[in-house]
């Protein structure tokens, strides 16, 4: 969740607010009065009904702009949202909230406006991966290489050696009682699967570490997994959510390493709960044990939620809490879509199996 000043935070949660959007490239700034409307899509899973290890999804914006003179196609823009200061008509507290760095991939003029589709650099990742580095090599080198080819900065920190902890903050220890550190996430990429794409390779590298990948607000490629709740939603700002009757709970994982090798941990009987199944030719027993200690038991409700007062501080993969006064529900944001037209609203969802599918 992005952090802002107290004055901006208070205004975000107020019904008395006006938003503006801004596009900025190296040569110009397209100001808010020309951006008529916009809508975004972002997700941490490529599946329609389940969370996913190793999902690497691009984010995008569709915009309507009252500017038919500018050539947008192929240009890269830093995108911002800001609140209007009613006293000065300027930017409240001088704070612009970065929403990402996007390339214009489609541009269509109609009347006095132009419709744009803006996407982050992962949009181009479905091309075959041709290494620009010697192979075999370490996973970090492969991830760096793909990011360079896509025009991204790798925002994942491999240099900081730190204790690994589970979702409750407990230290992770292997079966021999040895404390695990982040540096153990280095592993060798010995060869490449036939016709593998850059997106698929990033997916393998992410799922091996129990994460998904995306491009953050600053145009950097990062990985994460769902953590603790970052905010309790104000019931005055949302419509009543649609919630599944039962929780989804991860009880096991199954990884297909090759046609001849499959690794698993936990319960593999799908009638007992959610069993995450995925493929990764680089998975090892130690990597699987490490990621299982962090994601095993993770639970959530399938949720659809309309946030009337959209909050641009939320990031994909954040966890928010909904409470009805009696019960509280943690909601991992797997899908996040903003709608801007001077106001700002958001559709938030946590995908998962329906009640019928859980039986």
Identify the role of each PLM range.
Residues 87, 91-93, 108-244:
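Charged- and aromatic-enriched interaction segments used to assemble
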Residues 138, 142, 197, 283, ...:
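Short amphipathic alpha-helical segments
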Residues 1-20, 115-119, 125-127, 133, ...:
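Acidic, low-complexity/disordered segments
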Residues 28-40, 94-103, 232-242, 266, ...:
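Short amphipathic beta-strand/extended segments with alternating polar/hydrophobic composition
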Residues 1-134, 190-193, 202-210, 215, ...:
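Assembly/oligomerization scaffold segments
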Residues 51-55, 290-291, 347:
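Short secondary-structure boundary/capping segments within folded domains
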Residues 9-34, 38, 134-170, 356-359:
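Intrinsically disordered, low-complexity terminal/linker regions enriched in Pro/Ser/Gly
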Residues 281-299:
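Intrinsically disordered, low-complexity segments enriched in Gly and acidic/Ser/Thr residues
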